[in-house]
């Protein structure tokens, strides 16, 4: 069975880059009828917060990205300890003691000699006596994974065939001196034991993937199929990472972006397929194809979300917004008409409040000086509310007869006086919604 996972660290709010990863993994699982796991990588005890874990789940639920099971790495520490013991027994974990300063000096020396800055495996040469002496000096050992120095190859679902020489990569640190397991190790253990079959993540993880393939094999499992999507840039190609805090899913939700708009854009961004609004995840899954995605950096512009949001909200059935409309105070008998009229003239659902304010308390009349006398005369011909579907036609005919005006010179000033806007819904539909007309005085 196809099994994918989204594994965020609950150290902050998830952003559009995280969503792209989550969505790709979700769609792969759904298209195959498989399992989608939400795994909270919360082994960083200092930075992981429950409020962020709750926020991640809230964001995914808002988007409809429901998970089949949820896992927390903090609940699996015993499994990592057992796996580490197995690797030690197999000679694949070795203890090292270098300080960050010593490692930095080694790197600089290697670079000055024209060599790649790869860890020199000095820890392998330490005797038991050496280690005891270092501990007596107050040093705490940490643990590296011994890579087989061979080429690590895989068929990447997006990047194609990848080959990395393990000799050019430092043996990764898997366990810190305080015993905390690091991402590379915990993730490998989880992916192996949870039966993850496909992993899609950012191209900045390619080197991690090479080392994790060896770790997973050392654990006695076969690695999953990997794919690495391009990284996002800003609209002008600028680095986006510094701005991701302002592009959190929470902030986009609160700004009024429709979930369908965000999903539709992120499911196609960076692919050869055109971005089209899809109102369901089933539709997105049906057309999803990793083979359509390219390796080049992908431009993301938040402004692209607004036309899609407008389209999504305009096509939304009344049943989805009835409670929201009722909460505005719209009478039951006007709810259907109000949605029919307002839905085609909003971008965000929050815009509905502005339209109901116009209809319920009256708009501030917009009257050009040259139209003041015309409007004053016209308003004498408009009876007080309530109005019907016929009111607009009857009213404008009466004004036309009384003033001789016609066409735009007739309709535009009247619209601006009644609604405070030069453009908007069909006035014959608007009139029955008007509770107050300020222009009547």
UniProtKB/Swiss-Prot annotation:
Q: Where in the cell is it found?
A: Cytoplasm
EC number of the protein? 6.1.1.17
Molecular function GO terms recorded: ATP binding; glutamate-tRNA ligase activity; tRNA binding
Q: Pfam families per the record?
A: Anticodon_2 (PF19269), tRNA-synt_1c (PF00749)
Any one GO CC term of the record: cytoplasm
Record's catalysed reaction(s)? tRNA(Glu) + L-glutamate + ATP = L-glutamyl-tRNA(Glu) + AMP + diphosphate
At the top level, the lineage of the source is Bacteria
In this chain, ATP is annotated as bound at 242
Q: What keywords does the record list, in alphabetical order?
A: Aminoacyl-tRNA synthetase, ATP-binding, Cytoplasm, Ligase, Nucleotide-binding, Protein biosynthesis
What does the record list as GO biological process? glutamyl-tRNA aminoacylation
Q: How does it assemble?
A: Monomer.
HAMAP family, per the entry = Glu_tRNA_synth_type1 (MF_00022)
- What is this protein called in UniProt? Glutamate--tRNA ligase 1
Origin organism is Paracoccus denitrificans (strain Pd 1222)
């Amino acid at each position: 069975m196809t099994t994918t996972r989204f594994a965020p660290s609950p150290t902050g709010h998830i952003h559009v880059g995280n969503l792209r990863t989550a969505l790709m993994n979700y769609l792969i699982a759904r298209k195959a009828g498989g399992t989608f796991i939400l795994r909270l990588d919360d082994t960083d005890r200092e930075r992981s917060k429950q409020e962020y874990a709750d926020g991640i789940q809230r964001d995914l639920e808002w988007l409809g990205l429901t998970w089949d099971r949820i896992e927390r790495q903090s609940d699996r520490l015993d499994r990592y300890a057992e796996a580490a013991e197995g690797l030690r027994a197999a000679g694949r974990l070795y203890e090292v003691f270098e300080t960050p300063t010593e490692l930095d000096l080694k790197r600089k020396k290697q670079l000055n000699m024209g060599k790649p800055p790869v860890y020199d495996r000095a820890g392998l040469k330490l005797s038991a006596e050496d280690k005891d002496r270092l501990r007596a000096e107050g040093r705490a050992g940490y643990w590296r994974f011994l890579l087989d120095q061979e080429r690590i190859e895989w068929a990447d679902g997006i990047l194609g065939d990848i080959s990395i020489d393990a000799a050019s990569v430092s043996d990764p640190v898997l366990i810190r001196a305080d015993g905390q397991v690091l991402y590379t190790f915990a993730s490998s253990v989880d992916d192996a034991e949870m039966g993850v079959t496909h992993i899609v993540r950012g191209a900045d993880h390619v080197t991690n993937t090479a080392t994790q393939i060896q770790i997973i094999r050392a654990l006695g499992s076969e690695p999953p199929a990997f794919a690495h999507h391009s990284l996002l840039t800003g609209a002008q190609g600028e680095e986006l990472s510094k701005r991701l805090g302002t592009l959190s899913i929470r902030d986009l939700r609160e700004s009024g972006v429709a979930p369908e708009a965000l999903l539709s854009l992120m499911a196609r961004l960076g692919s050869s397929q055109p971005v089209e609004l899809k109102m369901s995840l089933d539709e997105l899954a049906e057309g999803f194809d990793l083979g359509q995605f390219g390796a080049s950096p992908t431009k993301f512009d938040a402004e692209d979300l607004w036309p899609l949001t407008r389209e999504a909200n305009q096509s939304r059935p009344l049943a989805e917004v009835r409670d929201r409309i009722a909460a505005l105070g719209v009478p039951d008998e006007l709810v259907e008409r109000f949605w029919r009229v307002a839905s085609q003239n909003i971008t965000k659902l929050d815009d509905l409040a502005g339209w109901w304010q116009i209809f319920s308390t009256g708009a501030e009349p917009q009257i050009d000086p040259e139209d003041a006398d015309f409007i004053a005369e016209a308003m004498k011909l408009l009876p007080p509310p309530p109005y019907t579907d016929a009111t607009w036609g009857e009213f404008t005919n009466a004004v036309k007869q009384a003033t001789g005006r016609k066409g735009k010179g007739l309709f535009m000033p009247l619209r601006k006086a009644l609604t405070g806007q030069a453009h908007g819904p069909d006035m014959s539909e608007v009139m029955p919604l008007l509770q107050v007309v300020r222009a009547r005085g």
